[in-house]
């Protein structure tokens, strides 16, 4: 069993590169690209993430993909409880033992869920914050899924591929503004909170990671459903170089009906989807699905 290194009593020990590799060897784990496994091996980076997440000591933190537990330990130091969702059964089996070894007495504050995060709709505790090093290949769907199913999530900080971070935090009019940007804005305010270098991971990815912080707000007031609004967003960006009149023709049933909806929403039919904010998409959905229909 990998034991914690001795550190000054005032500073709780965190796992470093040697600890992570030794622990992985103990359980026969080799990081896989399929699951997007890149483990954080730098204690200072862990402390930076936890500090940037601004976690209160009364909060329950949801962590997705805890892996070998390096970030988990930092979160346990800051939060009242940590609920970790892990898809890999080998990693999940080892996590409670790691918590006991590195944070004696904190195991009662640690709750493990063996599952695919995209399938989780219930948790042992209602989380108030999301802090996670997310696999690059599923980062956006996971964030949107969790915000949809856990309204108790009020804020968070996620580490994702740097260009994905830019897209999540993009604003209307930007070249990288797209489906992730608009859908995320339904749930809250997203902002870029920093960049993480490649050398703090094992194995080291080929690109930098970005930190995205979010604060939840109420969804737009509308009689249209979230599904109806998101359908407009998907249609608008499926052909993002086309005018909205053309891009929404399939969604509306015809170009003329798309134009009618756009005009009813007070929008220019010749505009493109990348210039509209979430409230504009809500108005388009409302025009297509009137309350008295």
From Swiss-Prot:
A molecular function (GO) term: 16S rRNA (adenine(1518)-N(6)/adenine(1519)-N(6))-dimethyltransferase activity
InterPro entries xref list: KsgA/Erm, rRNA_Ade_diMease-like_C, rRNA_Ade_Mease_Trfase_CS, rRNA_Ade_methylase_Trfase_N, rRNA_adenine_dimethylase, SAM-dependent_MTases_sf
Binding-site list for S-adenosyl-L-methionine: 38, 40, 65, 86, 116, 133
UniProt keyword rRNA processing, yes or no: yes
Gene3D superfamilies referenced in this protein's UniProt entry, alphabetically: Ribosomal RNA adenine dimethylase-like, domain 2, Vaccinia Virus protein VP39
Keyword S-adenosyl-L-methionine attached: yes
Record EC number: 2.1.1.182
Protein function: Specifically dimethylates two adjacent adenosines (A1518 and A1519) in the loop of a conserved hairpin near the 3'-end of 16S rRNA in the 30S particle. May play a critical role in biogenesis of 30S subunits.
Family note: Belongs to the class I-like SAM-binding methyltransferase superfamily. rRNA adenine N(6)-methyltransferase family. RsmA subfamily.
Name of the protein this chain belongs to: Ribosomal RNA small subunit methyltransferase A
Species for this entry: Paenarthrobacter aurescens (strain TC1)
